[in-house]
C-alpha cells in the first residue's frame, strides 16, 4: 500500500487560459426608420418591430403605419431576404403633452370591476394628482369608461384648448295637462327625443322625460310631450340633459373626444364629461353637443364658464394613459404610485412607458436625437408631408441634416409637386434644388397628390432586402417592383422630366405582348448618384469599420511596421487576392467581391487613372481595374507614431455601375 503524496499543480509550470476568438460583430443592418406624428409612439424613443404582425398589433391593422409597414416587410419581387426589422419614432409637428401609458391590462372587464378600491398619486408638471380611495372601477361599463372615471378622480385640467359659456339643462315655469307640458320663461336648452331631458318639479313623477315638442320656439319656450302625465301648475320645472348648449366660444375649437370642465370647479367636472358629437351650430364653435358623463347620467347645472381639452386619462393600446394638461418641453408626467398603480399596470415594473413633452421638432435637432438613441438603420422616411403640402422648407432641412452625416444615412423623400413632371428645369422643385446644391443622401421620389403608391416604403424595403451575403447579391433599385403598388407615371415625357430634375418614380411600361410596372431610375442626390451605390458604400464601410475594431480589440498590440500593416491588410482584404474569392468570404473586400459591391475588370478613364495613382503614390490603375480594388497603406510619420494615430489607409474599389437601358440595332442582311 503506497502513501499519498502531496503534489504541485501542473498549472504552476504550464497554465492554460481558456478563451474564445469571437466571430466578429454582425454589422449594420440597412433597415428603415419611419417618422410618424402618431402620439402612440412615445417621444424620445425609437420602437423596433420584427414583422408586419407586430406593427399591426401595436398601431392597428388599418393604421397608416401598418399600411406602409406592409409594403416594407414585403421586400421586392425576386428578393432573397426580407427586412429584419422596422423602426418608428414620433416627430412632433406641434408641441405635444407628456404622458405615462400603462402596460396592456390583459384582463377582462369583470376582473377590472373586481378592483374595488385603491390609492393612486401622479406627479405632473402642474402639480400632484391624487385619490386616496378610488372606488369607481366596479361602476365601469367599459375600459374606456373606467378611464373616464380615473380622469374624474385625477382632474388634470390646464387652461383648456377651447373656452366658452355653456348651458346644461334648463329651468322654466311649467304647466302640465296629461302628457302635454307647457314651458314658459325658459332659461337653457330643452332637448327631446330618445335622449330627451329628464324633468323634475312639483307634480312631475320620477323618471319623466321629454319626448317631443309640438309648438313654440325650438328647444325653448313652448309645448312639449312627456312620457308621463304631469300635474305641475305654474311652478318651477328643472331639466337635466345629455346635451351641452355652448352659447359662445371665446377661444379654440371643440373636438369630439374632448373633456369639458367647469372653470373654477363644479360638480359635473367630477364626472369627466366627454364630447361625443356636435348636434348643431358652428363646427367646433357655438352649438349643441352630445355629451357622456362617466356615470351615464345627465347634467343638472344651468350655466357655467366651461373649458374643453383632451381628457387627463384615456384608454389607449390596451392600457390607461395619463397625460399632462400642458404641452412643450416642460410638460411632464411621472410614473404613478399607490396601491392601485401596479394593479392596472401603471408602474414601470408592470410595463408602463413614459413619453416626454416636446416642443415642435426641428429636423436637425430631432434626427441627431434619434441617432443618439439608435443608429442601427440606414434609411428614413416621413409618413406625413413635413411642409403640409406646400413648399420644401422642412424637406430641405431634413436633406441638409442627411447631407451633414458623411454618407451614413439616406432620406427617402416623397414629393407631390407637379412641376418636375412638366419641364426638365423645374427650378422650384425639391429634386432640382438638391441637384444644384450637390446635397448628398436624399432620394426624391415623386407621386401625385393622393397617389398613395408608397414608393418611399418600397425604397426602404429594397435597401433592407439586399442580400449582401449572397454571391452577386447586389441589386439596383431600378426595375424593382411589388404587387399592389400603383404606377404614378405612364408618360415618357413626364418620366424624362422627372429624371432630369433628380426624381425617381414608379412607372408603367408596355410593348406588344408585355407590360411591366417598376421603380425607376433609382437616383440619389450627391456624388454617389445612384441609390444602390450609396447603400453599397454604407455596407462596405461598416464592414471595414467592424473588422478593424475587432482587430484592435482582439490583439495585444498593432505596431507601426510591416507586421502591423500586414495585419490591417489581412483584416480588410484576406481571401480576396487577385480578384478571386474563397468562400465563405474572410474579409470585407472578399465579401464585396462576392456580392458585387466591388466589381473587377472595369476600365478606368485616363482622368480616373491619374487621380488614383496620385492617391496611392504609385501606378495602381491597372491593378485596381483588373482586381476591382486596391488597398494603400502608407507608413506613418514619426509625429503620427508619437501620437499613436492612424497611418494613411485608403481603400479604392470599382463600383462597376449597372446597365439600366439597352439600345439595340436590328439589321436585316440580304
Identify the role of each PLM range.
Residues 28, 114-118, 287, 318, ...:
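Residues at beta-strand starts and edge strands
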Residues 77, 144, 152, 371-557, ...:
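A glycine- and small-residue-enriched flexible loop/hinge signal that marks low-structured segments
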Residues 1-117, 343-367, 375-397, 402-431, ...:
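N-terminal polar alpha-helical/low-complexity "assembly arms" that mediate subunit docking
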Residues 141, 145, 159-163, 310, ...:
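Alpha-helical scaffold segments that mediate packing/assembly in large oligomeric complexes
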Residues 51-59, 109-337, 397-400:
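Extended, beta-strand-rich, solvent-exposed assembly scaffolds of outer structural proteins
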Residues 1-66, 74-81, 520-670:
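Structured, hydrophobic secondary-structure cores that serve as assembly/anchoring elements
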Residues 74-99, 320-332, 600, 605, ...:
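Extended, compositionally biased
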Residues 311-328, 332-343, 373, 379-385, ...:
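Extended amphipathic secondary-structure runs
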Amino acid at each position: 500500500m503506497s502513501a499519498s503524496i502531496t503534489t504541485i499543480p501542473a498549472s504552476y509550470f504550464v497554465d492554460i487560459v481558456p478563451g474564445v476568438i469571437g466571430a466578429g460583430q454582425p454589422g449594420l443592418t440597412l433597415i428603415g426608420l419611419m417618422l410618424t406624428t402618431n402620439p402612440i409612439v412615445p417621444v424620445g424613443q425609437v420602437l423596433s418591430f420584427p414583422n408586419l404582425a407586430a406593427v399591426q398589433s401595436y398601431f392597428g391593422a388599418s393604421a397608416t403605419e401598418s399600411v406602409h409597414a406592409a409594403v416594407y416587410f414585403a421586400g421586392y419581387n425576386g428578393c432573397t431576404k426580407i427586412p429584419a426589422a422596422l423602426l418608428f419614432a414620433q416627430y412632433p409637428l406641434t408641441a405635444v403633452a407628456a404622458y405615462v401609458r400603462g402596460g396592456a391590462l390583459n384582463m377582462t372587464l369583470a376582473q377590472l370591476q373586481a378592483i374595488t378600491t385603491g390609492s393612486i398619486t401622479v406627479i405632473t408638471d402642474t402639480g400632484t394628482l391624487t385619490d386616496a380611495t378610488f372606488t369607481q372601477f366596479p361602476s365601469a361599463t367599459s375600459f374606456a369608461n373606467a378611464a373616464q372615471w380615473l380622469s374624474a378622480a385625477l382632474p388634470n385640467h390646464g387652461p383648456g384648448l377651447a373656452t366658452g359659456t355653456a348651458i346644461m339643462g334648463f329651468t322654466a315655469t311649467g304647466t302640465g295637462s296629461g302628457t302635454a307640458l307647457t314651458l314658459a320663461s325658459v332659461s337653457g336648452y330643452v332637448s327631446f327625443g330618445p335622449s330627451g331631458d329628464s324633468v323634475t318639479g312639483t307634480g312631475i313623477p320620477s323618471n319623466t322625460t321629454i319626448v317631443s315638442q309640438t309648438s313654440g320656439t325650438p328647444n325653448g319656450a313652448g309645448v312639449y310631450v312627456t312620457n308621463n302625465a304631469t300635474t305641475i301648475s305654474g311652478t318651477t320645472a328643472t331639466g337635466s340633459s345629455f346635451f351641452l348648449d355652448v352659447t359662445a366660444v371665446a377661444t379654440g375649437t371643440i373636438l369630439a373626444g374632448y373633456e369639458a370642465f367647469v372653470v373654477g370647479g363644479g360638480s359635473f367636472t367630477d364626472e369627466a364629461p366627454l364630447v361625443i358629437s356636435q348636434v348643431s351650430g358652428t363646427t367646433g364653435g357655438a352649438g349643441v353637443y352630445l355629451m357622456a358623463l362617466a356615470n351615464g347620467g345627465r347634467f343638472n347645472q344651468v350655466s357655467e364658464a366651461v373649458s374643453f381639452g383632451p381628457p387627463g386619462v384615456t384608454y389607449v393600446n390596451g392600457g390607461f394613459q395619463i397625460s399632462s394638461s400642458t404641452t412643450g418641453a416642460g410638460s411632464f408626467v411621472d410614473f404613478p404610485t399607490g396601491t392601485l398603480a401596479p394593479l392596472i399596470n401603471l408602474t414601470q415594473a408592470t410595463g408602463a412607458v413614459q413619453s416626454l413633452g416636446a416642443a415642435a421638432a426641428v429636423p436637425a435637432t430631432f434626427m441627431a436625437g434619434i441617432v443618439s438613441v439608435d443608429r442601427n438603420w440606414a434609411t428614413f422616411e416621413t409618413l406625413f408631408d413635413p411642409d403640409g403640402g406646400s413648399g420644401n422648407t422642412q424637406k430641405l432641412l431634413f436633406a441638409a441634416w442627411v447631407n451633414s452625416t458623411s454618407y451614413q444615412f439616406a432620406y427617402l423623400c416623397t414629393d407631390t409637386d407637379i412641376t418636375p413632371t412638366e419641364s426638365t428645369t423645374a427650378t422650384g422643385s425639391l429634386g432640382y434644388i438638391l441637384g444644384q446644391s450637390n446635397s448628398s443622401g436624399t432620394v426624391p421620389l415623386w407621386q401625385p397628390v393622393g397617389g398613395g403608391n408608397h414608393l418611399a416604403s418600397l425604397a426602404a424595403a429594397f435597401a433592407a432586402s439586399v442580400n449582401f451575403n449572397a454571391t452577386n447579391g447586389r441589386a439596383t433599385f431600378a426595375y424593382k417592383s411589388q404587387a399592389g403598388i400603383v404606377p404614378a407615371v405612364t408618360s415618357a415625357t413626364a418620366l424624362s422630366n422627372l429624371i432630369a430634375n433628380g426624381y425617381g418614380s414608379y412607372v408603367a411600361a408596355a410593348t406588344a405582348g408585355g407590360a411591366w410596372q417598376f421603380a425607376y431610375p433609382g437616383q440619389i442626390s450627391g456624388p454617389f448618384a445612384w441609390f444602390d451605390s450609396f447603400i453599397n458604400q454604407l455596407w462596405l464601410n461598416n464592414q471595414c469599420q467592424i473588422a478593424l475594431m475587432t482587430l484592435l480589440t482582439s490583439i495585444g498590440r498593432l505596431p507601426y511596421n510591416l507586421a502591423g500593416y500586414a495585419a490591417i491588410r489581412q483584416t480588410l482584404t484576406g481571401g480576396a487576392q487577385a480578384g478571386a474569392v474563397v468562400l465563405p468570404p474572410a474579409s470585407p473586400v472578399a465579401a464585396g467581391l462576392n456580392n458585387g459591391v466591388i466589381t473587377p475588370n472595369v476600365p478606368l478613364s485616363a482622368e480616373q487613372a491619374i487621380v488614383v495613382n496620385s492617391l496611392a503614390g504609385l501606378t495602381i490603375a491597372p491593378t485596381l481595374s483588373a482586381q476591382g480594388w486596391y488597398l494603400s497603406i502608407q507608413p506613418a510619420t514619426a509625429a503620427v507614431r508619437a501620437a499613436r494615430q492612424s497611418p494613411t489607409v485608403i481603400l479604392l474599389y470599382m463600383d462597376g455601375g449597372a446597365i439600366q437601358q439597352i439600345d439595340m440595332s436590328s439589321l436585316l442582311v440580304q
